[in-house]
Each structure stands twice: as C-alpha cells, then as structure tokens.
C-alpha cells in the first residue's frame, strides 16, 4: 500500500510525518530505519506518527521513532511540526491542542505570528525519573568518562538529557564525548547530550548529540533541558534565547514545579508517498 507523508523541519531538525488518523497502517521500527536512511530512503532525524488518542482528554496521540528504529518519549521540534501538520491537514480546527506522548501530555499553541508554542510540562530532576543513577538529587553531577571527570546536569523533558557547559561552542567535543555519555551506564535508557555555551544571562548557544540520531541541527527538548540547567545553576534568567545550528528558540521557565514553554517555527518542505 502507498502511504502519504509530509517532510517537515523545525530549525533544520527534520521529520517524516505520517497521518495515521485518516490512513491506517501498522508502522514498525524497521520501517523507521528503512525510511530514515538518507542514501536509500527518505532521510530524516525522526519519524512522527499522528494517531487518534487513547485518552478522551487529549486531541491526538504523538509517537516518535529515531532513524535507527528506536522509539523515544518526546521531541520538542517535532511537537511544533506536529501542531503545524494537524492544522494544515485539517485534522483539527483548534489553535490550542493537547497531545499524548510516551513521555506525558503536552499542550501546543499555534500563534497568530505563525510561531508555535509548546507547553512541555515541568522538567523532571529526580535521578530515578530521568533515569540517571545517582545517590541523591543535585544541580550537577560528576561523571567518569574514560578516566576523565565530566561535570553535567541531568534533566528529563519527557526524555533524558545531560547538559555540559563549554567555553567554545565551535570546538565542543560533541562527536567524541557525545556518544560516550549517550551510552554511559549511569544513564540506563541512554541520554541526549547538550553542549551549552552561555553568552550572557539571556542568550546561549547549544549543540546537541541526540540519542539514536547523532548531532542534529536543533533539538527542542535539548534546548528546554539546557535552559532548566542554566537557570537552576544561576547562569541565566528566564525568558532566554537559545541559538542552535539550525536557528533560535525562545524558552521560558519560572522554576521547579512550573512548565517549560518553548516557542519556535515549524516548516513544511514537501509531500510524498511511500510504499509500505
């Protein structure tokens, strides 16, 4: 059978989006891996599935697969594309929608200026909820990586993140430390790794090594996690701007117990069909 799909991106973090509300198909990890190959498939960072909800209190179910076939809990840039997609496809007329993810319920708002705001919910900082192996909760942790001690913050935005502060974003050890921390045994579900350079109290630069995808042009949950880490440690103030290789996100967080708000663009690239 042929399935209609849309190619989208949020600041260069690119997605294949499938409407499984009006189309019916059983998508498996092998399909994500096959379609995700940039040489022999469609090519993307993540596959986003738009499904009818299981929960009557939400509008849609949102599932996410990495290009290696692994299913993940959350994707912030994908959430903005999800909101743009369901409105463009007339799956809803609402400008504010509630979406069920593997990592919890999020709220999406399409603003009059075309930007999309996502209420990502409160961050999780308790180690076992991230999950991260630590004796007790702290603002930062020391991690032994090949005999080198690395200082990092650990945050869950529905998916696990480690955040490291660096002095030079261009020479950050994204491709050397990134995969080692991703697979570190103290992160039992693996982890996304953010390298954060604080420019001033309102602006920072960020590069992210994404679990199962490698370095991407942008990572929405990574930007949220970096903002939480920076505000928690007194480096920055809310609201703040985070510049990623693909562009800029605005993040707001009022502190523990409060939701993280992320605002940025979502862009449709093309429509296509793929054989299942």
Swiss-Prot record:
It is found in: Cytoplasm. GO terms for molecular function: diaminopimelate epimerase activity. GO terms for biological process: lysine biosynthetic process via diaminopimelate. The record marks 270 as: Important for dimerization. The keyword Ubl conjugation does not apply. The record marks 161, 210 as: Could be important to modulate the pK values of the two catalytic cysteine residues. It holds the Pfam family DAP_epimerase. Pathway: Amino-acid biosynthesis; L-lysine biosynthesis via DAP pathway; DL-2,6-diaminopimelate from LL-2,6-diaminopimelate: step 1/1. Its EC number is 5.1.1.7. Substrate binds at residues 13, 46, 66, 76-77, 159, 192, 210-211, 220-221. GO terms for cellular component: cytosol. The active site is at residues 75, 219. Keywords: Amino-acid biosynthesis, Cytoplasm, Isomerase, Lysine biosynthesis. InterPro entries: DAP_epimerase_AS, DAP_epimerase_DapF. It catalyses: (2S,6S)-2,6-diaminopimelate = meso-2,6-diaminopimelate. Belongs to the diaminopimelate epimerase family. Catalyzes the stereoinversion of LL-2,6-diaminopimelate (L,L-DAP) to meso-diaminopimelate (meso-DAP), a precursor of L-lysine and an essential component of the bacterial peptidoglycan. Homodimer. This is Diaminopimelate epimerase. The gene is dapF.
């Amino acid at each position: 059978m042929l399935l209609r799909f849309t190619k989208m991106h949020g600041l260069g973090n690119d997605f294949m989006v499938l409407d499984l509300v009006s189309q019916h198909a059983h998508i498996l990890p092998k399909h994500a891996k096959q379609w995700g190959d940039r040489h022999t498939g469609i090519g993307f960072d993540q596959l986003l599935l738009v499904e009818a909800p299981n929960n009557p209190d939400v509008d849609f179910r949102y599932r996410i697969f990495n290009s290696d076939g692994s299913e993940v809990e959350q994707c912030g840039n994908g959430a903005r594309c999800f909101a743009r997609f369901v409105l463009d496809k007339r799956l809803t007329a609402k400008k504010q929608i509630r979406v069920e993810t593997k990592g919890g319920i999020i709220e999406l708002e399409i603003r009059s200026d075309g930007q999309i705001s996502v209420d990502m919910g409160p961050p999780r900082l308790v180690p076992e909820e991230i999950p991260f192996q630590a004796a007790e909760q702290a603002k930062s942790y020391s991690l032994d990586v090949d005999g080198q001690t690395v200082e990092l913050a650990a945050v869950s935005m529905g998916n696990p993140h480690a955040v490291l502060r660096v002095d030079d974003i261009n020479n950050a050890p994204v491709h050397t430390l990134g995969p080692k921390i991703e697979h570190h045994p103290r992160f039992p579900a693996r982890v996304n790794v953010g390298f954060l350079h604080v420019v001033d109290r309102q602006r920072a630069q960020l590069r992210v090594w994404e679990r199962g995808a490698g370095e991407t042009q942008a990572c929405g949950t990574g930007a949220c996690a970096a903002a939480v880490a920076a505000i928690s440690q007194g480096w920055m103030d809310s609201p703040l701007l985070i510049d990623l290789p693909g562009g800029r996100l605005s993040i707001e967080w009022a502190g523990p117990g409060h939701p993280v708000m992320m605002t940025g663009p979502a862009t449709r690239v093309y429509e296509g069909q793929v054989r299942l």
